[in-house]
A protein has these predicted regions:
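Hydrophobic alpha-helical membrane-insertion segments
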Residues: 1-3
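Ribosome-associated RNA-binding proteins
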Residues: 5-181
């Protein structure tokens, strides 16, 4: 973000930064209004996704009077709330998953190597910071980025690795991987 001489903010096109092995992606900025006795007070809210591109992810939403402050606040909050998500071969999800949050629904499918990230806006940001390189995802219901991201995170948390499934079913890992398509 650059400041012109007359105080007007100019946003740079680069919405993602990489600092100390954690990639930060700005998903959504919104102007918010608080109506008070003397009139309206304007501020900004920012929705940010951070991750180490190796299975760790954090999401946060923060508000401030200025855009850079809101982004900085959200980045700090997201870094404090990192969670580990298991990845298959470090590039995709283990199995097909479905997540729901409010009216936001998401379907995600594991994809063969070289497929890439076939997903829209907020889901693509989640996949990129998480380190998922091959996935097919479809967002259903609302287009609200807050609900879509939370639905995506819920879906990712629900997935089980072959090791977890083998413990639950009391079978060997080889038997479970053998049936995988």
């Amino acid at each position: 973000i650059k400041r012109k001489w007359d105080g007007i903010l100019i946003m740079e096109n680069n919405k993602d930064k990489k600092t100390d092995d954690i990639l930060e992606k700005l998903v959504h900025i919104n102007r918010i209004t608080k109506v008070v006795k003397g009139g309206r007070r304007f501020g900004f809210s920012a929705l940010v996704v951070v991750g180490n591109q190796n299975g760790k992810i954090g999401i946060a939403h923060a508000k401030a009077k200025q855009v850079p402050d809101a982004i900085k606040k959200a980045n700090e909050l997201a870094r404090r709330n990192l969670v580990q998500i298991p990845l298959r071969e470090g590039r995709t999800i283990h199995h097909d998953i479905f997540g729901k949050d409010g009216a936001g629904k998401i379907k995600m499918r594991a994809a063969p190597k070289g497929t890439g990230i076939i997903a829209g806006g907020p889901v693509r940001a989640v996949c990129e910071v998480l380190g998922i390189r091959d996935v097919v995802a479809k967002s259903l219901g609302t287009a609200n980025p807050h609900n879509v991201i939370r639905a995506c995170l819920k879906a990712l948390k629900k997935q089980n690795s072959p090791k977890q499934i083998s413990i639950i079913r009391n079978k060997k890992i080889a038997e479970i991987i053998e049936k995988r398509g």
